[in-house]
């Protein structure tokens, strides 16, 4: 991972930032996919599998959130970081994944109550 204390000034550093942003997209997308897979398992009544998938989803989301935190710390609200479309896209992925996980957690709990 790149040193986020030094925001990119060169093409190589910009490419490194793009790699970090892609890592954010990949992890947040993985978190969302695992959450939806967990919901599918819950609908089928396999709550142990659903819990395991939600745990994996949480870990992927934690990885994505860590990357986001480092990006924010690197900028420190000073506007050092150039905002690109891919960075906005990454933030969108993260936020929708967080929301999906929260809602899917509630849906799984409802399925458990209905099956009880």
Spans of model-derived segments:
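Terminal alpha-helical segments
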Residues: 2-116
């Amino acid at each position: 991972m790149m040193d986020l204390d030094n925001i990119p000034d060169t093409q190589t550093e910009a490419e490194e930032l793009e790699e970090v942003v892609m890592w954010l997209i990949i992890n947040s997308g993985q978190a969302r996919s695992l959450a939806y897979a967990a919901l599918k398992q819950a609908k089928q009544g396999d709550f142990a599998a659903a819990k395991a998938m939600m745990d994996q989803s949480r870990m992927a989301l934690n990885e994505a959130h860590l990357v986001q935190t480092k990006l924010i710390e690197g900028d420190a609200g000073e506007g050092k970081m150039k905002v690109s479309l891919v960075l906005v896209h990454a933030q969108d992925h993260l936020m929708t994944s967080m929301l999906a996980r929260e809602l899917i957690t509630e849906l799984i709990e409802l399925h458990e109550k209905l099956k009880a």
